[in-house]
């Protein structure tokens, strides 16, 4: 409920700020005079912007299973699978959530992810590489980290943030398109080619800039998931797991782009590219855990 209220409050705040800004700049009267209704435009953008994010959220488990070829453990076939189920059951109980589905996906890289539309209908999966190279304590810490994502409602939070971002990227791109169409292309009869070209270009540019905001939120929630992992599995085990991941940073990332934000780690990014990273540097995560031991 808090996240929904936060989402609504964010929308209202941005609408008010946008309205005041457009009035102060003298843009709103011009737009209304050219036939562009801001309220209708915002509703249109909100419907499409939020719909895309929500559809992705509700389909996230299915998409994750298909894109990673994850095999959900229905009946354990060996001692490792039995241990995985028991460990996830124990951790989810400690975190106060319903036990998620547990799966294994084929990848040499050590990684794991959690996804699902709510904390009581989630999926936690680990790679074959992680099971081969990590100790049980380290695997438990990684699972605790992913359970932390689920318990914190990170999938829902990021979907809501992405929906808000989608809405306002569409909204402001169309305002820019309308201004350019009227002022530069001198089109007074509906929307001309200038509107469509400018809108597409503006959506691309604004979308790239907006993704920096989404990734900033993503990096912040990684610290929270690490803290939950340390709480459930112990700081020592969580730090050891991250240190082992650090030793594998040169390995290619086999996680689909759509799931990178929900993995335990991603490839190292430097300079400007770091702004688009969904995970903080492993050294920063290790330092944060060490400081709170």
Curated annotation (Swiss-Prot):
Enzymatic class: hydrolase
EC annotation from Swiss-Prot or TrEMBL: 3.4.24.-
A Pfam family hit: Peptidase_M48
Cited InterPro entries: HtpX_protease, Pept_M48_protease_HtpX, Peptidase_M48
Subcellular location: Cell inner membrane
Keywords: Cell inner membrane, Cell membrane, Hydrolase, Membrane, Metal-binding, Metalloprotease, Protease, Transmembrane, Transmembrane helix, Zinc
Any one GO BP annotation for this protein: proteolysis
Residue spans crossing the bilayer: 2-22, 38-58, 156-176, 193-213
Domain of life: Bacteria
GO CC entries: plasma membrane
Protein's UniProt keywords contain Magnesium: no
Names of the cofactor(s): Zn(2+)
Keyword Flavoprotein: no
Protein family (similarity comment): Belongs to the peptidase M48B family.
Record's protein name: Protease HtpX
Gene name of this polypeptide: htpX
């Amino acid at each position: 409920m808090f996240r929904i209220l936060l989402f609504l409050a964010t929308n209202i705040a941005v609408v008010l700020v946008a309205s005041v800004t457009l009035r102060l700049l003298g843009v709103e009267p011009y737009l209304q005079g050219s036939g562009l209704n801001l309220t209708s435009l915002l509703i249109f953008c909100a419907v499409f912007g939020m719909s895309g994010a929500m559809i992705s959220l509700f389909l996230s488990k299915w998409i994750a299973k298909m894109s990673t070829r994850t095999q959900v453990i229905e009946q354990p076939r060996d001692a490792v699978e039995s241990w995985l189920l028991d460990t996830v059951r124990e951790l989810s109980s400690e975190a106060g959530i319903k036990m998620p589905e547990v799966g294994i996906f084929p990848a040499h890289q050590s990684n794991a992810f959690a996804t699902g539309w709510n904390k009581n209908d989630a999926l936690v999966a680990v790679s074959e590489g992680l099971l081969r190279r990590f100790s049980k304590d380290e695997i438990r810490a990684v699972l605790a980290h992913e359970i932390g994502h689920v318990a914190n409602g990170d999938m829902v939070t990021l979907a809501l943030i992405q929906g808000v971002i989608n809405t306002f990227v569409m909204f402001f791109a169309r305002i820019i398109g309308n201004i350019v169409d009227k002022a530069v292309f001198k089109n007074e009869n509906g929307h001309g080619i200038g509107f469509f070209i400018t809108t597409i270009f503006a959506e691309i540019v604004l979308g790239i800039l907006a993704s920096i905001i989404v990734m900033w939120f993503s990096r912040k929630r990684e610290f929270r998931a690490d803290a939950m992992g340390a709480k459930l599995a112990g700081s020592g085990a969580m730090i050891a797991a991250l240190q082992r991941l650090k030793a594998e940073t040169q390995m290619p990332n086999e996680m689909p782009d759509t799931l990178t934000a929900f993995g335990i780690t991603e490839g190292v990014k430097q300079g400007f590219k770091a702004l688009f990273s969904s995970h903080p540097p492993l050294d920063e995560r290790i330092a944060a855990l060490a400081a709170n031991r």
